[in-house]
Amino acid sequence: MPELPEVEVTRLGLVDRIGGATVRALQLGKPLRWPIGVAPQQLAGQRIGELARRGKYIWMPLQDGSTPAGGLLWHLGMSGSLRFEAQLPPPGPHDHVELVTDRGSLRLTDPRRFGAVVWSPSLQAGCAARLLGGLGVEPLEDGFTASVLHQGLRGRRVAIKQALLAGDIVVGVGNIYCSEALFVAGIDPRLAAQRLSLARCERLVQAIRQVLRQALMAGGSTLRDFRDAHGMGGAFQLQAQVYDRADQPCRRCGALVRRIVQGQRATYFCPVCQRR
């Protein structure tokens, strides 16, 4: 699933190319996860503002002249990607949405069809407010601190990895990045979340930021389907310390990396470097 790094890489690849463009048409293919919530023809002639990201969502504000006209909230689902080109090839069976502008076309490709694009009157109202209202803090912003994490973990008996994946304390730290950050912080993913001390929370905050920044520099991770706005795959998975390295030597100590299942998701960790 595209997580924060993949979504941010996508946004960065689009922001200067599509910002300021004028919508000509919105073409819909097979129904996606949610109805779009607006008649596509109503978007024609509207201008696209500066793209923003919240968690794993991309917000595309629209203007009708000088008047705000809501915006489109894009979600890549389990396997989606957005690509923008002046001239795209003919759509294939997994291409479900195409936003045609005076600069080119933006296409949502999603083999598993869990992705979505929905119209909302603003980020603070309508479906955007419902989808984003329960999200935690952004991990790369100043609001994500050890004290915020420590407070959010209080009373949580679930494993720390599952607490991070929930997204209501901190957003966008997906499965691969949870495994990697817990390794960097030296924390066993099975440890009860409520048992993390403030000092270990500080290490974990720094580890999450380190791993996410490395992933951004690498263009995200492409385990199967993800491509950025230029059609290129990410490379972070090639430098992973533990993720998808079961029964291989830990790059730090040489012990064999273990694989377990937590909440139906694969977890990878070093039994020597990561302590409870």
Curated annotation (Swiss-Prot):
Subunit structure: Monomer.
Keyword Oxidoreductase: no
Catalytic activity: Hydrolysis of DNA containing ring-opened 7-methylguanine residues, releasing 2,6-diamino-4-hydroxy-5-(N-methyl)formamidopyrimidine; 2'-deoxyribonucleotide-(2'-deoxyribose 5'-phosphate)-2'-deoxyribonucleotide-DNA = a 3'-end 2'-deoxyribonucleotide-(2,3-dehydro-2,3-deoxyribose 5'-phosphate)-DNA + a 5'-end 5'-phospho-2'-deoxyribonucleoside-DNA + H(+)
Listed Pfam families: Fapy_DNA_glyco, H2TH, zf-FPG_IleRS
CDD domains registered for this protein in UniProt: EcFpg-like_N
The gene coding this protein: mutM
Purpose: Involved in base excision repair of DNA damaged by oxidation or by mutagenic agents. Acts as a DNA glycosylase that recognizes and removes damaged bases. Has a preference for oxidized purines, such as 7,8-dihydro-8-oxoguanine (8-oxoG). Has AP (apurinic/apyrimidinic) lyase activity and introduces nicks in the DNA strand. Cleaves the DNA backbone by beta-delta elimination to generate a single-strand break at the site of the removed base with both 3'- and 5'-phosphates.
Name of protein: Formamidopyrimidine-DNA glycosylase
Annotated zinc fingers (FPG-type), start-end: 241-275
Species per Swiss-Prot/TrEMBL record: Leptothrix cholodnii (strain ATCC 51168 / LMG 8142 / SP-6)
GO biological process: one example: base-excision repair
Molecular-function annotations in GO: 8-oxo-7,8-dihydroguanine DNA N-glycosylase activity; class I DNA-(apurinic or apyrimidinic site) endonuclease activity; damaged DNA binding; zinc ion binding
Domain of life: Bacteria
Note on how the cofactor is bound: Binds 1 zinc ion per subunit.
